[in-house]
């Protein structure tokens, strides 16, 4: 049953008595949220002892890490961390995975509805028509050492691509371009989607010393990516359909994940109204961190460091003693098993022939078994998330561990584009969070 937000929700409010002044305030509650700006009404006389508290300017809300702060309204993705559910535009991923293609899901996220057959064909045609980047863009990637940062190659490639169309940069043309201009925003979305796939493939080919194969019209987004990276069958020159199907489902699962650290970084940058490539660079840089997207590569290396099943108990003991961290377990949002985890295990089961070649997966399964039965983990609601096994899907498909994160970013590009497009349709307001100054005041240069 479709549930829609009430047009006129009942009036609710938070009542505050400030014991500093005895003043009473009523702050409206809408969608189980209060407007932080309403606290500016809660003022007090200047704090003479420490003026930096700015009591006369209104009460501030301190929330390090944004653990309980909503910074925007969005209609794209809904996550219920207590129930372990994810919905894209109101559709459960349980109903989407295996029934809709990745490109259909991208259309849903970005444009708000499932594409008709004609719309899906048009989207694929527009992607096919995006030209291969100019040679200087590829040369930037090739200037890196082959064993250099793959993430750095992608970021550098994007930066070079940005310079190939200076008229797409608002600061260069001296005006805002994309705000409330969905047609122009959509052109950039198509440009980024196509080029992210090509640049990521180019970085991979440079890394392993393989020639880059240009995309081919008539192939799907994922088929073309596998073609560009050289992951094709000798007999047909085309990607293995089983591998295409595995990536289709995996990328549907991780196409968007609401207000993540990287999405917030993208939107923080977008609030200043630059071009979309600048926003993507911000998002990718945030994803590189081991507490965010980098966790997928770290989770694999964490399992790799264990080495064998016999070493699992010692690893668990070190984690419980606080000496080490078990990446791939626990999540900022979920208090139950990550809903994507179940589907990823299904994908791995279907790739059993390839998976058997990776003995580390048996170690990962043993870690999962031991942790799921250990009171230390169960009492803290530390359950496996998608990071733990997603890496093994890519490994089974023939990609090295160091390419896991670039693959993850490519799969998330469509989600980033959805959030950027939504932001460009909202009233402009630069994100400029405050701080609580706790340092010294009024020092003398003579002291």
From Swiss-Prot:
The keyword Membrane does not apply. It is an enzyme of class 2 (transferase). The active site is at 331, 387. GO terms for biological process: tricarboxylic acid cycle. Pathway: Secondary metabolite biosynthesis. GO terms for molecular function: acyltransferase activity, acyl groups converted into alkyl on transfer. Keywords: Transferase. Its EC number is 2.3.3.-. InterPro entries: Citrate_synth-like_lrg_a-sub, Citrate_synth-like_sm_a-sub, Citrate_synthase, Citrate_synthase_AS, Citrate_synthase_bac-typ, Citrate_synthase_sf. Belongs to the citrate synthase family. Citrate synthase-like protein; part of the gene cluster that mediates the biosynthesis of oryzines, natural products with an unusual maleidride backbone. The two subunits of the fungal fatty acid synthase oryfasA and oryfasB probably form octenoic acid. This fatty acid is most likely activated by the acyl-CoA ligase oryP to give octenyl-CoA before the citrate synthase-like protein oryE catalyzes condensation with oxaloacetate to form tricarboxylic acid. This is Citrate synthase-like protein oryE. It comes from Aspergillus oryzae (strain ATCC 42149 / RIB 40) (Yellow koji mold). The gene is oryE.
